[in-house]
């Protein structure tokens, strides 16, 4: 069988996938980065590193495969987030563009991988895609695992007494989430990462994410698009901004606005890290309502994913 290019739009329909298995000792693990572009508190990364050699992969999906494509500002942020992640991975991030099922299947086959790991996404479109990928790779004999790296509580964990999902935020958050066990503590960055760079990886520039007109220049003055920048932003907010969050958040020019949204969206910091950073600073916060309001805003983020999960026609 001829070896196909990793970028070729090959249809896998009616094709039986067979991945050659050799000694499991030498088999690398493919780690698929998505909206979790960080090393700290990354459950899939931790699990992959425990297995041994890791092939870190990012795949920019073709627009034709997506119902919604990211806008210019999101693409600009993603460009710099990927550069930062690649630097954190010592230049070992493998970048591709196309259909994730085709690309992951070929990567597993060509590199004798034993497992493919990722952190879960919760939008209906992503769930459908990931389910297809997981079943296809499992049928091919691979160990496929997904983890919660995005939410404080899994959507299926928080239900009403009749086992139906909540539709109103306050009972969802107060009666549902807060009555559950506390969210897990953030995981440390793996101390030992054995990373493998492949020959045919694209570069971040190859993805053409940056705008052709330089409207983005002033944005660089206000954002450090990196995992370290996310940590600094969180620290600045917790120590200087959360004190008057309940009222100050209504004024975008004030320091009380957390400015964590893009970091959370692209996963450069985890919601668990934000949750516990705020909780651990409770002694420094004069008015408890400011802490409660910030945590409930993280709860609103949870509720959005929760509704998309339980009501997939919502979009």
Segments (PLM) and residue ranges:
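Acidic, low-complexity intrinsically disordered regions
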Residues: 1, 28, 72-73, 149, ...
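Extreme N-terminal basic, low-complexity initiation segments
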Residues: 2-9
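Glycine/tryptophan-enriched, flexible segments
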Residues: 5, 142, 164-315
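Residue-level recognition of conserved structural "scaffold" positions that shape functional pockets
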Residues: 10-11, 274
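Trp/Phe/Arg-rich N-terminal binding region typifying the photolyase-homology
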Residues: 13, 17-183
């Amino acid at each position: 069988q001829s070896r196909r290019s990793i970028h070729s739009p090959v249809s896998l329909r009616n094709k039986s996938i067979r991945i050659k298995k050799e000694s499991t000792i030498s088999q690398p693990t493919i780690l698929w980065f998505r909206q979790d572009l960080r090393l700290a508190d990354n459950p899939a990364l931790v699990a992959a590193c425990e297995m041994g050699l890791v092939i870190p992969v990012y795949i920019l999906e073709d627009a034709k495969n997506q119902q919604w494509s990211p806008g210019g500002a999101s693409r600009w942020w993603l460009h710099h987030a990927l550069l930062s992640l690649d630097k954190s991975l010592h230049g070992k991030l493998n970048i591709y563009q196309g259909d994730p099922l085709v690309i992951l299947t070929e990567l597993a086959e060509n590199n004798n991988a034993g497992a493919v790991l990722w952190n879960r996404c919760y939008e209906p479109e992503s769930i459908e895609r990931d389910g297809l990928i997981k079943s296809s790779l499992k049928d091919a004999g691979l160990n496929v695992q997904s983890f919660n790296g995005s939410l404080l509580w899994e959507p299926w964990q928080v239900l009403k007494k009749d086992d139906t999902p909540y539709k109103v935020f306050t009972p969802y958050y107060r009666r549902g989430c807060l009555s559950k066990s506390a969210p897990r503590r953030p995981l440390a960055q793996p101390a030992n990462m054995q990373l493998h760079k492949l020959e045919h990886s694209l570069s971040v520039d190859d993805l053409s994410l940056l705008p052709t007109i330089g409207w983005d220049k002033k944005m660089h003055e206000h954002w450090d698009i990196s995992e370290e920048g996310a940590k600094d932003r969180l620290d600045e907010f917790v120590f200087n901004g959360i004190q008057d969050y309940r009222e100050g958040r209504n004024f975008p020019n004030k320091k009380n606005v957390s400015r964590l949204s893009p970091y959370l969206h692209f996963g450069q910091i985890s919601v668990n890290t934000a949750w516990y950073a705020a909780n651990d600073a409770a002694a420094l916060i004069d008015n408890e309502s400011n802490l409660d309001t910030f945590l409930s805003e993280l709860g609103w983020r949870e509720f959005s994913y929760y509704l998309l999960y339980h009501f997939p026609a919502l979009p």
